[in-house]
Amino acid sequence: MKLLETVKLLDGQPNATRRALITAHLDALGVRYVAQPYATGTNLFVDLGRAASKIGVGTHFDRVPISAGANDNGSAIAVGLDIIRKHQEAGSEVGVRVFFFDEEETGLQGSRAYVAHYGIKDLVGLLNLELVGMGDTFALWPVDAARSGPLLRAFEAVARQQQVGCHRFDQLVTNTADHVPFRQAGLPDAFTITCITDQDIAIAQHYFQAIERQAAPARLLEILTQAPLFRHYHQPTDTYEKLSEAALARTSAAVWETILATQ
């Protein structure tokens, strides 16, 4: 199944149905998963390989009610499921934990509940996936020039090998994503990966310049929505037809090769 077909199945479905579609996919793969219920939702995660230490791959399955939830974040779910498939087919023993968090859109409640219950002691880092279905370049955030870590170095090296652009951003409009609870708990090698275009980069520069000039909120929103990445963000138009199979496959390949390089 193409990755885009997975996104299509998820499009517009209620969050509970999206979670059920993920578990059905995992059942079809014959993969065991852990469901972690907490006060307001339920996380899912899958442990792969015999290694005690795990490389985390983060996704979230909830969507904002107004949005179909394709790029945000059906794209990441499709890649996460593909990483599980690749691990199975390779017969790999490298330790990986793939997360499908609930309630990212309402204050990172799912990832916060995971960290509060399980902690971070068996994780070497987290590759968190957010908006990975459009574009031909990777944005790593929030990652400044001084930040370092095995996963970060490996991902950037893989991107160079695959001749894919890869840029660090201190901030990508908002720094809120499921990497946050892990960093706050003391896991420094945790960051978010987003797929972008050169046009997104140019508009981001314009956006931050406007912030420095203290532009009005309406003007900032006008600038932001010119970026392909944010044109359909949290909108009913965030549907699978807007996404690219190539972007999904490129992300999956980069994440998988990073996992292999870090084992």
Predicted segments — roles?
Residues 1-49:
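A non-catalytic alpha/beta surface segment that caps or lines the substrate-entry region
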Residues 49-55:
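Proline/glycine-enriched tight loop/beta-turn segments at coil->beta junctions
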Residues 56-58, 97-100, 124-128, 190-194, ...:
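Structural recognition of the beta-strand scaffold that forms the well-ordered cores
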Residues 64-183:
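Acidic/histidine-rich catalytic neighborhood of metal-dependent amide-processing enzymes
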Residues 202-263:
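His/Asp/Glu-rich mid-to-C-terminal helical/loop segments that flank catalytic regions of hydrolases
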Residues 11-19, 69-73, 104-107, 148, ...:
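Solvent-exposed, acidic/flexible segments
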Residues 130-133, 195-200:
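Glycine-rich beta-alpha junction loops
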